[in-house]
Amino acid sequence: MRLILSLPVLVVVLSMVLEGPAPAQAAGEISSTFERIPDKLKEFGNTLEDKARAAIESIKKSDIPAKTRNWFSEAFNKVKEHLKTAFS
């Protein structure tokens, strides 16, 4: 099933790559592109850092960790009780 779905996607991607850039997308000079790479990487890093911090803060503020910890504790205690009754 995956092969059937991946082949059309591969054909579309190859056709897009072989078609080349549109006239509006064509870069004038490669050197200007290389000069912008550090700025783009810094911007990407800052954006990634902000999103990661926001996600961590959201997790800290939510009650999901406490609920997960309680669920694991309860499940562990149930398994422990079953083992005690089975081997006693």
From Swiss-Prot:
GO terms for cellular component: high-density lipoprotein particle; very-low-density lipoprotein particle. It is found in: Secreted. Residues 1-26 form the signal peptide. Its main location: secreted. InterPro entries: ApoC-1_sf (IPR043081), ApoC-I (IPR006781). The keyword Lipid metabolism does not apply. GO terms for molecular function: fatty acid binding; phospholipase inhibitor activity. GO terms for biological process: lipid transport; lipoprotein metabolic process; negative regulation of cholesterol transport; negative regulation of lipid catabolic process; negative regulation of very-low-density lipoprotein particle clearance; triglyceride metabolic process; very-low-density lipoprotein particle clearance. Keywords: Lipid transport, Secreted, Signal, Transport, VLDL. The keyword Signal applies. Pfam families: ApoC-I (PF04691). Belongs to the apolipoprotein C1 family. Inhibitor of lipoprotein binding to the low density lipoprotein (LDL) receptor, LDL receptor-related protein, and very low density lipoprotein (VLDL) receptor. Associates with high density lipoproteins (HDL) and the triacylglycerol-rich lipoproteins in the plasma and makes up about 10% of the protein of the VLDL and 2% of that of HDL. Appears to interfere directly with fatty acid uptake and is also the major plasma inhibitor of cholesteryl ester transfer protein (CETP). Binds free fatty acids and reduces their intracellular esterification. This is Apolipoprotein C-I. It comes from Lycaon pictus (African wild dog). The gene is APOC1.
